Amino acid sequence: MQRYFRFGALMMLCLLSFLIFADGEAAGKIKAEDFSYQNISLGDSEEALRARWGEPDVQNEQVIWGIHLKTFTYGDIVVSTSATGGKVVDINLIGEKYHLRKDVHYGATSSYLLKVYGKAERQFLDGHTCYVFSHPDHVRERLILNLDAENSALASARITMLPLTDEEADEMALSDDESFVELDLKHSFIASKEIDVSDLPKNDNVKLGGYVK
């Protein structure tokens, strides 16, 4: 009888350990849903943005890493689309009102961020200490969590498919990955290197590197 009791207790302990481990794994993992905000995702069209969020408070244009962008400001949120493709390429969450998955919000502690999104090394980008997480299926899509310099709590968040450094911009420009077509990186790369393309053929089937079939 004692043998059956011990066996049952052992099985219960194993099951409890598995459930605790599974819950920890589920809590500390980046997910595809982390790369959208209020029904707007990277790659959505400008038309979809206006349909879901309405007209912006402010509309402007800017250039980042040679990429021409249109920016739409909704309160403390700035959404950028590629001027070439018209697709959402950057969602910048500033201010103190945003809320992400599992109630991640302004002022959330670093330990809680790692509990929700998993382990990450701190990096320094654009003057901020931050955590950078890549999309589980699209590594060039990133969630950037900027930390407060004094207490390392969450200050702002950014969902982006833009390059993070000049070197990365050049690498993406020379890539054959068609997912970068919205950014018109090849055109930007040529312009930034001051390459004279005036004598190149104007055929639509011409690409950097040769013709396509």
Where are these regions (language model features)?
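Bacterial N-terminal signal peptides that target proteins for export
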Residues: 1-10
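Second-shell loop/turn segments in exported
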Residues: 33-39, 96-104
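Sec-dependent signal peptide cleavage junction
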Residues: 20-28
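A cross-family detector of function-defining hotspots
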Residues: 27, 34, 44-84, 105-213
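Bacterial N-terminal signal peptides
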Residues: 9-19
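A low-complexity, Ser/Thr/Gly/Pro-enriched, surface-exposed linker/loop concept
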Residues: 87-98, 106-111
